Regions:
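Flexible beta-alpha connector loops of hexameric P-loop NTPases
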Residues: 124-128
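P-loop NTPase Walker
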Residues: 1-120
Length: 135
């Protein structure tokens, strides 16, 4: 992968620490690339590395969530090609399947499934289909 020339705003998002962020921009503006780089920088931070499954990344579409996970996998594999004995990166590659990268609906559904007892829902609840929600 060649060197990317990030804009000032993109670099600020990549480097920001100690807070949650919301990245909102037009289609094709590089949101996915910026978020992948931000996550990669955090999991490879020498002073304070985190595990990839400690992030919550929420997108609007299944395609965007899948692309995010695929690109993050590619970024980790690229780094492993340069340093195949990096145990932390090997663990991150394994943890990627546990990463919380999903759509808004999927994220909310997971929260409800996990905490149904606290909000008084039947544990067998299910999300309505598009047709059902139009009724």
């Amino acid at each position: 992968m060649g060197t990317i020339n990030w804009t000032k705003d993109q670099q600020q998002i990549i480097d920001m620490r100690g807070c949650n962020i919301l990245v909102s921009a037009a289609a094709g503006s590089g949101k996915t690339a910026v978020l992948v780089e931000r996550i990669f920088k955090r999991i490879t931070d020498k002073r304070d590395p985190v595990n990839v499954d400690q992030f919550v990344v929420v997108t609007f579409t299944k395609l965007a969530a899948a692309q995010m996970k695929d690109r993050l996998r590619e970024r980790i594999e690229q780094a492993l090609a340069e340093d195949p004995s990096n145990e932390h990166l090997l663990r991150q590659e394994g943890r990627l399947s546990l990463a919380h990268i999903s759509t808004v609906h999927s994220f909310c559904s997971e929260i409800v499934k996990r905490y149904f007892h606290r909000i008084g829902l039947d544990p067998a609840f299910r999300m309505g289909t598009e047709a059902e929600t139009r009724l």
